[in-house]
Amino acid sequence: INTGYDARFWNYDESVQKTGVLTAAFFSDKRVINIKGLDLFNKLASLLPNISFTIVGESDISVSEFLNLQPNIKVIGVQTKSQMKELYQNTKFYFQGSRLEGLPNSLCEAMLCGCVPIGSKVFGIPDAIGNTGILFDTEKDLEQIVEFVNSDLGVYNFSKARNRIIKKYDFSKRVEKIKKSIF
């Protein structure tokens, strides 16, 4: 039974002017920084110097101890669920550059809030993104991501990401599947 997400809470307001690129990762050592693809996020920021980038979730260590962060990257600490919702709602792109990942909750929550997804082609990430954003294999693909970010994306793209998660992972569908498996 798949994970489910509450589309009523993780909502999207079409009137909000969305900007920037966001990623979220809880990390406690250099290994996690690499697994979560923060080095690729940093490299992408270097290729898009006029766009703001945000890393959410810094924990026991400072990511800047391990990466020479680009000046357009802001690192903020762990956020509450409501704070994450507000960040997602105001952000245009969500980056999930993990090298090892199941089905990322933060990616699905961001897509429900209208973020256009950018993700690596590992495990559950392509299944979540489908054709609503852009998928990449390696650092060599970053130029394609730059073109994608600079393209003219409108409300349709934001809604498309949201609708995919509702269709595949709506919480009410999960509840129904659980009920059927029990009774």
Question: What would you call each of these model-derived segments?
Answer:
Residues 4-19, 172:
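Acidic anion/phosphate-binding donor-loop and adjacent secondary structure
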Residues 13-36, 42-48, 54:
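Conserved donor-binding/catalytic core segment of Leloir-type glycosyltransferases
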Residues 63-85:
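Nucleotide-activated donor-binding/catalytic signature segment of Leloir-type glycosyltransferases, i.e.
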Residues 86-91:
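Short alpha-helical donor nucleotide-sugar binding micro-motif in glycosyltransferases
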Residues 99:
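Aromatic "clamp/platform" in nucleotide-sugar-dependent glycosyltransferases that forms part
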Residues 116-119:
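Short hydrophobic beta-strand element within catalytic cores of glycosyltransferases
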Residues 131-140, 147-154:
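Conserved acidic donor-binding segment of nucleotide-sugar-dependent glycosyltransferases
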Residues 140, 153-183:
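A charged, aromatic-enriched C-terminal amphipathic alpha-helix characteristic of glycosyltransferases
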